Amino acid sequence: MSLEGFAELRAQMEAFQGRVHGHLGQQRHAMEQLLAAHRQEVEKLRLRTGAVQQQLARLAGEEQELRQNISSLQERTQHTTAQRDAYAAQRQKLAAERTQLEHDRAELHAMLARKQAELQRQREAIKRQHMRDNPEVRVYEQLLGLYVRASRPDSLEFAFRNVSEADARAECSFTLDLGADGYRVAAAQPPLPLERLRDLERDLGSSGDLPAFLKAIRAALVTAMAGQADA
């Protein structure tokens, strides 16, 4: 490649990185807003759950007191049947209220679980959009012979072509898992040292710089391929 061609490629890469960085920033801002809204909803649900717990504790105390009163009433013949019936009716009312509160608590727990699952799905969708749906990725595909496909709902598969002057069919590849705990590189071909993979994952997770990550892992894969050829 001539110096002019290299300068043009470098300018394209820098411009692409800037646009991707801006896009990732926008997506990160959207995720922060989503997380803030989710935290508010979760906090409301937790407050409601706490109130239900307090009411259940109060009911438990009242039920215990009623049991003692009923037991005492049964032992004392001077108490009237009307008073005993009143205690029994109050106990039934408290039991019905307890049943309703337990039902409400179960619904709140289910609602919280659905909210958390929805948030996780949205986070994974945004991650996939960052790396696959961005139209700028097509430019990067042409520059580095990159091919991207969604092998599973929670992962993306990357393949680099044009990695060997001696073998036009040679390619390097890896799979990037998009889990809730962050990015995880899997199934690298050729294999890379575990420590190197963890460094790449940490860099991507902390910076969000996809172009820099792709350049770094491509260089590592090409070096590993060259080492295999020399062995």
From Swiss-Prot:
Main location per the UniProt record: nucleus
Highest taxon of source: Eukaryota
Any GO CC annotation of this UniProt entry: Ndc80 complex
Subcellular location: Nucleus; Chromosome, Centromere, Kinetochore
The entry's keywords: Cell cycle, Cell division, Centromere, Chromosome, Coiled coil, Kinetochore, Mitosis, Nucleus
Residue runs in coiled coils: 23-132
Record keyword Cell cycle present: yes
GO biological process, one term: chromosome segregation
Database matches in CDD domains: RWD_Spc25
Pfam short name (any one): Spindle_Spc25
Keyword rRNA processing in record: no
Family from the record: Belongs to the SPC25 family.
Function: Acts as a component of the essential kinetochore-associated NDC80 complex, which is required for chromosome segregation and spindle checkpoint activity.
Quaternary state and interactors: Component of the NDC80 complex, which consists of NDC80, NUF2, SPC24 and SPC25.
The protein's name in its UniProt record: Probable kinetochore protein SPC25
